[in-house]
């Protein structure tokens, strides 16, 4: 087609056609720039849109006139071997693509990169009619929108004439098998004529999370395996649940009760109650919509379903606990006798009794936690736990710890969480869900359809306030006082805001933490660190004062600063920077001005107080104008003012009470005391609420204690004196009004920061409510929500009017337990052991028996192992059993030898090796003997007294041969005792001479006398005995022993007759002062002299003078030489005496009238000459020795004159003094009373 066919078209018409077709125009990349359109001839038009193909590149036909008139271009255009696809213009302007764009925006062509055409899909079955390549090319060419310039159609068939006819036919089946997708499936393939696409395999998506560019969650996200399980809708798909351990009432679980006591049924309450019976549920409802009713109904049904399980209701404050108690009594009708209210005021013993008897408990979470940890409460018996104000269940709060403790021992319990605001962020709400093991959420907002009819209108008014002139003046003075400290802090690059009025507590704490973690803080010297810590501490406290000044008034600010000044001036150690602030002239000027203003009665420290008084007065005036009814007094309405600090609350109440009696204001604060005011205990809080409901008080100025959960009556006006960035607190405040009728909320906001904080809180609340309602951003714990009721049981609802028990209406007081006159026995401690655990010990002989096996009660018995008698046990090699030389050396080195050569042989510990020490309290330095040590010593002494005399020196169990004390010959004292001769017996009669017990002489005595003189005498002489002294004993005896010895020397005590069975008192062995604490009757009778005399002889008793105490110590065994008197041996064997006779220091001694007497003389031979020397003892062939067992090494001693020998007596050494110190010495007891 030639160009002459369009030569008669007018230019205007062509422009219109060009505009209509330009939106989808295709421009090849090799086109030259458009030339200015001009008219060539009378019927020809040249517009510059000449295709390159028409220039002869592809053989297009052209007329001869055009070739003649065309001028050669001076630019050479290079054409590539392959044609580059041209860019596609979607529209000439943005208005074509985006018609809604603004007209002032820059418009231009929008280029879109052409996409590659998708490959042709091969059909599995060839169709009978296949289009040829030429027809496809023609069809594709028709789809392309050409330019208005007509072009000639090119016939491609000329270029394809040489190709075979089957070049474009489908390939054979055996050649195109690879292109057909292979599907592997367990089900047979479907017969279909359509092409089957291969299934796209998805990679595992565990732990992945797809989000949008703006941080939102992408739709259709596959939950990871770590998240909670999906909600199964069919019973066959659900995981089997183990049966509960709680005892259920089979008849009661068939129905569940919904009370109709409060009037018409609310559908949302019914839905929430039904879901809360079978799932761990989080209920988020605006205040005043019946959360208390929902909790009471669920508690009632679990009280019916279980027979002995327990139900716990927890609330953070005591007023909230008492509020729920009344709801359960008046709505659910739970018997009062089965309920109790426990707090920290009751003793643990009283709470333990309540846990053992009652079933329903109203408690604070801290008390529940303590009772569970101490074993007072049994976690396995709890079936339902109700958590009020559940948004507190974050971090380490008591709610979290209680649920965690229950989960350790109890897998079957229900959790019901109640709150008005679940959290201030998505993370906080998720933490509450995880800590309380929530599986379902029921949330309603004020815009929800099913609660709109029960929510009254709330008018919210925001009042923006500017600071007063007084506040601006105080800011300037206080800023100048703090400016040097702020500059010093900024110089260290720890803080960057040089305006002191911008200080906040949070900002200071954050800056301090950041500086300490930075490199400058870590590398700083200790002096710099101390300076920075002091600066941060002072400015943090000043940040709180600035907040009081800006948002609460001059009064609270002055109270805080006055305490700061008193602390610095009073202690005189306030620190350098505190003194710098207090002593600055600006600070002093500021305090003087504030003091002058405070002294005025009509002074108002903040413009908020002015607006507050106007708002409250207008509200009461409007109420009196008839808004509350014609018969209602003006003060019948109620107002609550919320503030953050107690000082501010007291200032507000003071200003409001100036407008009495119309306004009767009272503060409502917590229980803790502050520096300037005391708190309100539970009784005062309840009394204030009662007066507020009754009308005695019509305005309450409350802190955060009044924000959560309290039902403080019908409130028509809420005034928020300060704003909070927490949406939870703001919503709790606003929920106090609009319950029974329309309410009004007034917000007093300072321009700037407080205004922005409120807007942030409002937006945050709305966003969180939408997220919780959708549930797409949270993960729920369906795996921990047990149904408790068997799945085969489907309880039916029973809507009825609950009859309140008579006991619930008679006593209006709270069910607090009273202290009993006589406390009961303390309950046994519970150790929270798992069920079925085997306590105590098992004998090794019964390990294989089935009698005590835990599985025996289930009918499972252990199969006894049968031994094959025919099979012999393998006999090991002898070398593998016995020890070789190397093993024996190792055994001797490790087990038989000890280093240092102390003891070569190591034996078993012998408890009888030190009997004296076991029966004696040894010396102590700083720590005295304990109760059990004294008891053991007393026990050993008593056992010693009960032992037979002849076995007292024998080791038990036959470790040593019995002693030969019974074979000692009769003492020659018997004849003299019977004769009672007035004169001393003759020395020639050896039978009448009593040989005193001998011991080794001292070294000095042995050196004095020569060896020739130290021989056995031919004539018996009265001699004094030698006593033993214990070197290791205490040098100073006890006071009791010294007094006893002194009495013996100064007086003569009558002695019993010889025929009497009475034995004289002996001396008490007292090695330390601790022995005085033993019992007075610890005296032991270890035997007498008669016990060692031949039993064939007539036994007599030696009456001795003096007094003594019975000794509880074992006898000391001495080595004696056989004595021969006048050539006649007293005994043919050694004489072994268990105790040494104590004699006084007399030179001659004899027995007169059955009593041993002593004569003192200054002259005479040395009495030491009568004793054998050590050489004589060594040379004696007939002398036999016995091992001497004594606790301490012996030493020499002397006798004191003028004292008669007494049994079991110790005396102390004295040189030449009759009244000297006595030496402790053991003597032979001459009493056969033990026989």
Curated annotation (Swiss-Prot):
Give the EC number(s) under which this enzyme is classified.
3.6.4.12
Q: What is the protein name stated in its UniProt record?
A: ATP-dependent DNA helicase mph1
Q: Which cellular component appears as one GO term in the record?
A: nucleus
- Assembly and partners? Interacts with the MHF histone-fold complex to form the FANCM-MHF complex.
Q: Which residues form the Helicase ATP-binding domain?
A: 272-440
Q: Where is the composition biased (Basic and acidic residues)?
A: 61-72, 947-958, 1065-1074
InterPro entries attached to this UniProt entry: DNA/RNA_helicase_DEAH_CS (IPR002464), FANCM/Mph1-like_ID (IPR039686), FANCM_DEXDc (IPR044749), Helicase/UvrB_N (IPR006935), Helicase_ATP-bd (IPR014001), Helicase_C-like (IPR001650), P-loop_NTPase (IPR027417)
Q: What does this protein do?
A: ATP-dependent DNA helicase involved in DNA damage repair by homologous recombination and in genome maintenance. Capable of unwinding D-loops. Plays a role in limiting crossover recombinants during mitotic DNA double-strand break (DSB) repair. Component of a FANCM-MHF complex which promotes gene conversion at blocked replication forks, probably by reversal of the stalled fork.
Motif interval(s): DEAH box: 388-391
Principal localization reads: nucleus
The superkingdom listed in its UniProt entry is: Eukaryota
Positions binding ATP in this chain are 285-292
Question: Sorted alphabetically, which keywords does the UniProt record give?
Answer: ATP-binding, DNA damage, DNA repair, DNA-binding, Helicase, Hydrolase, Nucleotide-binding, Nucleus
Q: What class of enzyme is it?
A: hydrolase
- By which gene is this protein encoded? mph1
GO MF term set: 3'-5' DNA helicase activity; ATP binding; ATP hydrolysis activity; four-way junction DNA binding; four-way junction helicase activity
- Residue ranges annotated as compositionally biased, kind Low complexity, are 1160-1170
Cellular compartment(s)? Nucleus
Mark out the compositionally biased spans (Acidic residues).
1075-1085
Family from the record: Belongs to the DEAD box helicase family. DEAH subfamily. FANCM sub-subfamily.
The Polar residues compositionally biased stretches are 137-148, 1095-1114, 1146-1159, 1194-1209
| GO biological processes | double-strand break repair via synthesis-dependent strand annealing; interstrand cross-link repair
Q: Which parts of this chain are annotated as the region Disordered?
A: 20-78, 96-148, 808-827, 944-1117, 1144-1235
State the organism of origin: Sclerotinia sclerotiorum (strain ATCC 18683 / 1980 / Ss-1)
